[in-house]
């Protein structure tokens, strides 16, 4: 079969071993059938653009397989979750530092090869790679266990090539073993939606028997609900979601009430976790917060389209009476490890929709359009 290809230069940023290679971009999505052990397939982002303008922002390419450096591992990728953060990277709200880049930060795979001085992991181990790709390990934040706040924090799929590919490299210290109870595709969303949701739940300071609100009910929201019901069985959970399917799903999973993001909850809430990319739900959540309550914003950024809604903030209604607002910034390896142990104990099996690697654009468009029931995951190999 004749396949037209285009060659572009790319600087690979998969770890300490940095090199300049070439991407071979297939103008079709059919790659040559000839096997090449030194090549891999990947979905690559070449430029920033809104999804409304380009519904296929990622291109299927063939690229040289990376080699693990000192204390690194080569991961054969089996699954990778699809996250709202990828939309932010594609559309430029949290842009990658360099292009082209391979997105994806909810990576499940097996160790194919280890680099020199690697001792913790061995070939065949099943591991996960989360949003945290690397931190300096030496600053005050890292030394205090807050590596998520490190100024040199590197994010998987944004600052280094991620999991929308057949292989990736990562420092073995930032790869986390995956419990056997989870399949590959169901483990993937636990690394981001689950781990960051778990961190948000901890940051609320929740006590059993109090009332918890969840604003937004995508991948992270439905996992937080399951975790909260397990850890705090006497806590009533109220869900605010933008469409009827999400609200019905929340009720199926045990929410005592589910309404629109603009509705008033039937009771004041002691804690609310917001997982939306918008400002309006923040203002409405503060209105539903109990005196002395805490709102935790679980979002890497907020979009500007409804920023004017902040003008509706009224100090006496939304902020007075010692209401608190706290944000979540990234995750630590401890968050991911603790959450995976907890999820295996419950066991917490997330709802997923599977897509092929080459259909990553379709998954992203559905996510953008709000077609959500559980988590979207790319299944490879």
Regions found by a protein language model. Name each.
Residues 64-80, 93-140, 174, 179-181:
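Glycine-rich beta-strand-centered segment in the early N-terminal region that forms part
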Residues 127, 180-266:
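Mid-domain Rossmann-like dinucleotide-binding core that forms the NAD(H)/NADP(H) cofactor-binding site
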Residues 5-13, 23-108, 170, 379-381:
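Short N-terminal strand-loop motif that marks the start
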Residues 24, 28-38, 241, 283, ...:
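C-terminal hydrophobic helical "lid"/dimerization subdomain
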Residues 279-351, 380-381:
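Glycine-rich phosphate-binding loop and adjacent beta-alpha segment
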Residues 135-215:
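NAD(P)H dinucleotide-binding glycine-rich loop of Rossmann-like/cofactor-binding domains
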Residues 269-273:
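Short SAM/SAH-binding signature in class I
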């Amino acid at each position: 079969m004749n396949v037209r290809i285009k060659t572009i230069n790319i600087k690979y940023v998969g770890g300490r071993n940095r090199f300049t290679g070439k991407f071979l971009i297939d103008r079709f999505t059919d790659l040559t059938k000839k096997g090449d052990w030194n090549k891999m397939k990947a979905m690559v982002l070449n430029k920033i653009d809104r999804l409304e303008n380009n519904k296929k922002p990622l291109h299927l390419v063939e690229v040289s397989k990376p080699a693990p450096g000192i204390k690194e591992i080569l991961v054969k990728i089996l699954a990778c979750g699809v996250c709202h953060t990828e939309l932010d990277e594609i559309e430029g709200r949290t842009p990658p530092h360099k292009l082209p880049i391979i997105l994806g930060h909810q990576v499940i795979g097996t160790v194919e090869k280890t680099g020199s001085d690697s001792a913790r992991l061995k070939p065949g181990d099943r591991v996960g790679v989360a949003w945290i790709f690397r931190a300096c390990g030496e600053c005050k934040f890292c030394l205090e266990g807050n590596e998520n706040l490190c100024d040199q924090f590197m994010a998987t799929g944004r600052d280094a090539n991620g999991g929308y590919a057949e292989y990736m490299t990562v420092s073995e210290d930032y790869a986390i073993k995956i419990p056997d109870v989870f399949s590959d595709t169901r483990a993937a969303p636990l690394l981001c939606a689950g781990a960051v949701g778990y961190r948000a739940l901890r940051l609320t300071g929740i006590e059993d028997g109090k009332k918890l609100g969840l604003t937004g009910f995508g991948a992270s929201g439905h996992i937080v609900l399951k975790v909260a019901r397990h850890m705090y069985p006497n806590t009533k959970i109220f869900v605010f979601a933008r469409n009827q399917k999400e609200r019905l799903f929340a009720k199926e999973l045990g929410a005592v009430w589910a309404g629109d993001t603009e509705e008033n909850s039937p009771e004041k809430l002691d804690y609310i976790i917001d997982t939306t990319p918008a400002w309006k739900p923040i203002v409405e959540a503060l209105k539903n917060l109990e005196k002395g309550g805490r709102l935790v914003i679980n979002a890497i950024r907020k979009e500007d389209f409804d920023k004017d809604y902040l003008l509706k903030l009224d100090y006496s209604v939304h902020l007075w009476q010692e209401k608190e607002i706290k944000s979540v910034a990234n995750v630590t390896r401890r968050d991911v490890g603790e959450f995976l142990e907890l999820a295996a104990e419950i066991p917490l099996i997330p709802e997923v929709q599977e897509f092929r690697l080459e259909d990553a654009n379709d998954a992203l468009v559905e996510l953008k359009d709000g077609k959500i029931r559980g988590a979207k995951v790319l299944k490879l190999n």
